[in-house]
A protein has these predicted regions:
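Juxtamembrane boundary at the C-terminal end of a transmembrane helix
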Residues: 175-183
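Interhelical loop and helix-boundary elements at the membrane-water interface
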Residues: 1-168
Length: 183
């Protein structure tokens, strides 16, 4: 499983370093923005999924053969929280806001609406990629007969379980950051 982590990790560093090569973007804002969107998908999924699992209504399993605890309610919670974080970041983080203006002006005639729509699209794609990354890592663990990928982070299953949602989303964020740096 260590073979698939270096390229996305390098792309995370690329997101942070693009700011040094572009006068328009500052990667110091894009890296936390990216991580906040992706991890908020994890947090939203966990919170809403757990809430519904404990409720009388119960939860509806998403992909029980891959990851038995994942639910549709958790998926919805992850999408909603990551959209909220992405839009708020696009509105209030100085450099991210400027980049979303670039994106927004290409999406809509109304720059503010375009900024929000651009942030929502990026956030939704990052959220979905983070979910797929989590599922891919779960498949690899199940194929290897491993339940937890380590004990460095108690209660979370290990380092790879924390990083899995970042692995597929990192290349997309790198491409977006690189593209926006050229405008």
């Amino acid at each position: 499983t260590l073979l698939y982590t270096p390229p996305p990790t390098a792309m995370l560093l690329g997101v942070a370093l693009i700011g040094y090569t572009s006068a328009k973007l500052d990667g110091r804002f894009f890296l936390p923005y990216f991580v906040a969107i992706v991890k908020s998908a994890d947090i939203g999924a966990y919170c809403l999924g757990t809430l519904f699992a404990k409720s009388p209504m119960g939860s509806h399993k998403f992909v029980p053969e891959i990851s038995p605890k994942k639910s549709i309610e958790g998926l919805i919670g992850g999408v909603l929280l990551s959209l909220s974080v992405g839009i708020l970041g696009a509105l209030y983080l100085p450099n991210v806001s400027d980049a979303m203006l670039i994106l927004g002006s290409n999406i809509s005639g109304n720059i503010e609406v375009g900024r929000i729509v651009g942030a929502a699209i990026i956030s939704l794609i990052l959220c979905l990629l983070s979910i797929v990354g989590d599922l891919v890592e779960s498949i690899w663990k199940r194929d290897s007969g491993i339940k937890d990928s380590g004990s460095y982070i108690p209660g979370m299953g290990g380092i790879l379980d924390v990083a899995d949602s970042l692995l597929l989303a990192a290349p997309f964020m790198y491409a977006i950051t690189l593209t926006l740096s050229r405008f």
